[in-house]
Regions:
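Membrane-proximal helix-turn-helix segments that form the acceptor-binding/catalytic region
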Residues: 97-102, 138, 150-183
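A charged, aromatic-enriched C-terminal amphipathic alpha-helix characteristic of glycosyltransferases
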Residues: 365-398
Length: 400
């Protein structure tokens, strides 16, 4: 089978300035008899050396599509102009007649579109079987954001969400509902929300493939004398509210001496300086790593990952990485959404920060029990978020 892929992002083994890892790992898992030609706008700005490396690793041909001059011009000089548009600015991107002719004349068996905003490009190729990987429903993201009190408190964030929400709604209402196009998302609620917006659409939830797994696999046995706890990811909008609440609880906990005795905390990512300083001042052993050259190697040095995500859609890649590599993940509902794990069987889910503290108190006394949860989590991810399995499901849509 020959597939032509058109993508806003250049695939990469890890997310580089965008969601570039998902298409990479779907391509890694494909049947090797499937020939893929990729046309990419390379909005995540990979270098020529990186692009050549990706082409070799994935055994695909890659052609760069020039980003339209008007897109660059408006983003650079007239960014506020976007407020007046009915749709997100990237949704106005279309293939030129020569680009379209090249793809049509190549006569692929199917077209694979990556990036929600490329729906007009998809429509230009409406005579082909198509799969459109979104991978998230952006209108759901803004809908959720507008329902959060912390978003309303920040005027810039609130008005951005208020302006972007109807733009994505307008775009998604216009999605093609023909029988020869399937939409692929990595969130169950994303699919449900999209089906409400656009009745009749063929939208499907496929689990997000996990990324890298350390070799040899990490031995799941909590460190002694102190258990190593990791906070991974930048301190940003997605973690801000719940991370602040959790740090406050750690500092003000009546069990402070017990928590200090049994744990060492590491923050991996930028923006955590204030939290590290506050925990150190409270007597906790705390470390800060702003960047790890080998991310998987670094996370495997730890036993537990706490993920206090308070907003978002789809699947969180760093949570998948942690569980797949044998860490016990303690996270919020948003952190664990769409991941094939269950509370107290293969992960720990908490609602309020004080619940997380309760589990941290219990873990040192029942190490074996919580190690078994981490073991079950890894087993579930490796089986149900398997690259090959999910890639087979995706490419099957291209034959229907």
């Amino acid at each position: 089978m020959k597939v032509t892929m058109i993508s806003v992002m250049m695939p990469a083994a890890e997310n580089i300035r965008g969601t570039s890892a998902l298409p990479y790992h779907l391509l890694v898992g494909r049947d090797k008899s499937i020939e893929v030609i990729l046309y990419s706008y390379n909005l995540n700005r990979l270098s020529k050396e990186q692009i050549d490396s990706v082409a070799r690793e994935l055994n695909i041909k890659i052609y760069i599509l020039p980003v339209p001059w008007w897109y660059v011009f408006f983003l650079r000089f007239f960014s506020p102009f976007r407020i007046l548009l009915n749709y997100p600015i990237a949704n106005y991107i279309r293939l030129s007649s020569s680009q379209l002719d090249t793809i049509i004349n190549d006569n692929p068996d199917a077209i694979w579109i990556y990036g929600e905003e490329l729906s007009r490009v998809s429509h230009q190729l409406k005579d082909f079987r198509r799969v459109h990987t979104l991978p998230d429903c952006e209108s759901l993201y803004y809908y959720r954001m507008l329902g959060k009190r912390f978003a309303i408190r920040n005027k810039i964030r609130f008005w951005r969400s208020a302006f972007m929400y109807p733009k994505y709604l307008n775009m998604e209402k216009q999605f093609d509902t023909s029988s020869n196009i399937h939409y692929h998302l990595v969130g169950k609620e994303d699919v449900n929300f999209l089906k409400e917006i656009c009745p009749g659409i063929q939208a499907h939830f496929l689990r997000h493939p996990h990324y890298q797994v350390a070799k040899p696999a990490k031995v799941i046995s909590f460190s002694s004398p102190k258990i190593k706890v990791l906070f991974a990811g930048q301190y940003n909008l997605y973690m801000q509210q719940d991370a602040d609440m959790l740090i406050d609880c750690l500092i003000k906990s009546k069990d402070l001496s017990e928590l200090k005795e049994h744990y060492v905390y590491t923050f991996l990512g930028k923006g955590w300086d204030n939290h590290v300083e506050r925990l150190n001042n409270a007597g906790y052993e705390t470390h800060h790593i702003k960047f790890a050259p080998d991310y998987i190697e670094e996370i495997c040095k730890h036993d537990i990952q706490i993920t206090p995500i308070c907003i978002g859609t789809g699947t969180k890649g760093k949570v998948l990485d942690a569980i797949a590599n044998g860490l016990l993940v303690i996270g919020t509902w948003y952190a664990l959404e769409n991941i094939a794990v269950k509370h107290l069987e293969s992960c720990i889910e908490y609602g309020e920060a004080k619940e997380c503290i309760k589990f941290l108190k219990d873990i040192p006394a029942r190490r074996n029990y919580y190690e078994s949860i981490a073991l079950n989590g890894r087993k579930s991810i490796l089986e149900r978020h398997n690259q090959k399995l999910i890639s087979e499901c995706l490419f099957r849509f291209m034959k229907e």
